[in-house]
Regions:
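Short, P/G- and charge-enriched loop/turn segments at secondary-structure junctions
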Residues: 97-101, 122-124, 288-293
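Functional-site microenvironments in short loops/helix caps that host divalent-cation chemistry
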Residues: 119, 161-289, 293-298
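Feature responds to low-complexity, polar/acidic, surface-exposed segments characteristic
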Residues: 7, 42, 155-169
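Acidic glycine-/aspartate-rich tracts in secreted/extracellular proteins
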Residues: 139, 152, 206, 260-263, ...
Length: 313
């Protein structure tokens, strides 16, 4: 008798858990988070559309994306793992894929974070993420101004006057933006906020280091120890403070909103990275801050990500 295919069993388990824990409205949100159109999924019931979603992402080798979103929404559910080294899950970027590109609408430089396993969290759990892009820098005042002007969105209250930022702060991270503000920016740009896992992999690479540059504290970032007491231009500490992938300011300068909630109650959103207002301990890449999605602070900003599959080089 042939033994059962473990991946098929995992797919069945995944489908059952998604149907059990996600309502129809939550499935719509899940599709939005994944950059997919709910209406374009095959079928006309929650069950058939869930099946279609799994099949679509499986064909593209992107089931880890679905699992990451499911874990973010329902962290207490025992989700199956597909990070078993199978070829479908370990898809390399096609030959000739650039390491970076300039996102046309925003002007942000996006860096490729290659697919693979990495050590995650304080406990250094082995996790897998597919290819994705992340902004090299936090979104600056100049970047954010394009969004404000384009759709008439309300400008940040800190530093901006008459709807404009001070010219000397053009290349500083935009601050005093709520989680809802930055989600609106990402939607306008056709991008996303990073999940906790995406943010952390981009910040520490694969080896589980404590800071973007290594395991030991170094004065390579704008934290409380620097004594500046305000934001600095993005990349001010580059290249010494850069992450293994070239991301800047992932320790210090401003805390960054992620798309992840602290828990399934969805009352507080996770902040990562520390800021000029916080010390070296709070600027480790595993440190988790949190706040309500309506709050705005002059030490909190954000950066954005893009799913690899939506770009064709």
């Amino acid at each position: 008798m042939t033994s059962a295919d473990p991946n098929r069993q995992k797919l069945t388990q995944l489908r059952k858990l998604l149907i059990q824990h996600f309502s129809l409205d939550e499935l719509r949100v899940l599709c939005f988070d994944l950059g997919l159109e709910y209406e374009e999924l095959p079928g006309d019931t929650r069950t058939t559309k869930m099946h279609g979603l799994i099949e679509y992402l499986q064909r593209r080798g992107e089931l880890p994306r679905l699992l990451n979103e499911a874990v973010d929404h329902r962290p207490n559910v025992a989700w199956p793992s597909f990070s078993d080294g199978s070829a479908a899950m370990q898809k390399d970027a096609p030959a000739g894929t650039p390491k970076s590109f300039i996102h046309e609408k925003t002007g942000l430089e996006m860096l490729l974070i290659p697919a693979g396993e990495f050590l995650y969290g304080e406990e250094k759990e082995l996790k897998f993420l597919p290819n994705f892009w992340i902004a090299k820098t936090p979104v600056t005042n100049a970047h954010y101004a394009k969004f404000v002007v384009d759709i008439g969105y309300k400008p940040p209250v800190t530093w901006w006057e008459n709807g404009k930022y001070p010219p000397k702060l053009a290349n500083h991270p935009v601050v005093s933006v709520s989680w809802y503000d930055v989600v609106a920016y990402a939607q306008w740009a056709g991008l996303q906020l990073p999940t906790e896992q995406q943010w952390e992999k981009a910040a520490r690479g694969q080896d589980g280091r404590e800071y973007p540059w290594g395991n030991e504290w170094r004065p390579y970032c704008n934290t409380l120890e620097a004594g500046i007491g305000a934001t600095t231009p993005v990349g001010y500490y580059s290249p010494f403070g850069d992450s293994p992938y070239g991301c800047v300011d992932m320790s210090g300068n401003v805390c960054e909103w992620t798309y992840s909630w602290v828990d399934e109650k969805e009352k507080f959103c996770v902040l990562r990275g520390g800021s000029f207002f916080e010390n070296q301990e709070q600027s480790r890449v595993t440190y988790r801050g949190d706040d309500g999605p309506n709050y705005r602070f002059d030490f909190v900003g954000f950066r954005v990500t893009a799913y690899f599959s939506i770009f064709d080089f």
